[in-house]
Design a protein with these regions (language model features):
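Cytosolic regulatory regions of ion transport systems
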Residues: 1-184
């Protein structure tokens, strides 16, 4: 039928030049974040930072990485990213990175629980600073049941690797004519 109901899925194919207008039409009117904090310097966090450095000159990136040797490696590989060796769950570390200046926090550790907790901590900090609407939190989750916690934990976006895989598959199936696939 032609009626959209709650939990229905719709696929919209558009020209990439219409992306911003389409996202706005679906209620995703978001400004570009220039001050980004990545928690976790594993492959996902490192590659995201590398991609942002190459694509967005205005971006100011910081990465918090627990493992000292990994933090040193990342610091040597990236040109315009500040790398801090520490635990993203440590409130002193979050204070040290000037969390009040950060626009978006992306938790990309290998631990779902840590990613969720970092996001909750950031929301707590933002609320304490009376900046609750100014921070965007994103957390990588591998366990599908954790998506049920998103609204109660007040996390803006959950990153589900399975959905990103769907995006990649769609791009290849349509032989490169799809630039990106988004869940909206």
């Amino acid at each position: 039928n032609d009626v959209m109901k709650k939990n229905d899925k719709a696929y919209v194919i558009i020209n990439s030049t219409q992306m911003k207008e389409t996202l706005v039409a679906f209620g995703h009117n978001e400004k570009t974040s220039n001050k980004i904090l990545i928690i976790g310097g594993g492959n996902v966090g490192f590659n995201l930072a590398k991609n942002i450095e190459q694509s967005f000159d205005e971006a100011r990136l910081k990465i918090i990485e627990k493992d000292k040797s990994r933090a040193e490696f990342i610091a040597n590989q990236l040109n315009n990213t500040i790398v801090i060796n520490g635990n993203g769950l440590d409130e002193d570390i979050l204070t040290e990175v000037n969390l009040e200046d950060v626009e978006t926090v992306i938790a990309l550790t290998n631990d779902d629980e840590d990613n969720l907790m970092v996001s909750v901590l950031v929301e707590k900090f933002a609320k304490d600073l009376k900046e609750i609407d100014d921070k965007r939190t994103m957390a990588l989750i591998n366990k599908p049941n954790y998506s049920l916690l998103q609204s109660s934990l007040k996390i803006d976006d959950l990153i589900d690797p399975r959905m990103n895989t769907v995006s990649s598959i769609l791009k290849h199936v349509h032989k490169g004519t799809i630039e990106n696939a988004y869940t909206i």
